[in-house]
Amino acid sequence: MSTSASASTSRSATAANREVKPLNGVDTPTLFATIDAVRNQPELAEFRFRATNQWLDGTHSRTTIEAFDGAGGTHSHRNNEVYAADHPAVLVGADHAPTPVEFLLHALASCLTAGIGNIAAARGVKLREVRSEIEGEIDLRGILGISDEVRNGYRKISVRFTLDGDAPAEKLKALVEQSTARSAVFDVLTRGLPVEIEVRA
């Protein structure tokens, strides 16, 4: 083989390697390595996420998320993430941003979707579309103090997924089932947890 032919073959192989993308955008070797590492060193599984919130005006506030602890160290996000929250005018706000309960819907939907992507990649299923519609029903008589018999939060949340991928419907549905079984946000919403409130004044 000539030198030019060898160089051409090398360039073609390099280009082909660059074109190979992880299935569903998930780095499965790292995913499996992480699972093995945590299995062997359970202390690596301990994480602490945190955020700071600042009141701006009325029902408008801003939350900043910068870093978290886990895997034996402290990690900074690539960008300091800032999220605003407010109430719409009908709820005596200025509608600068979504309401906190709408962010809760976002948290649940995005957590389930992330799980679906990871699980599909681990099972060798290529996804073409994952879309969800999520709704929460709430009776404001609770938070307005009108009735102690009405809970303050959502009484029901409904999620409808549409999936398209290289697998039969049963396997696609199984992805959602497994994601739900392992979702941190779903767990918090359906099982609850203690919340500690400290006040400094």
Q: Each predicted region: which residue ranges?
A:
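Extended beta-strand/beta-hairpin segments
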Residues: 1-106, 116-201
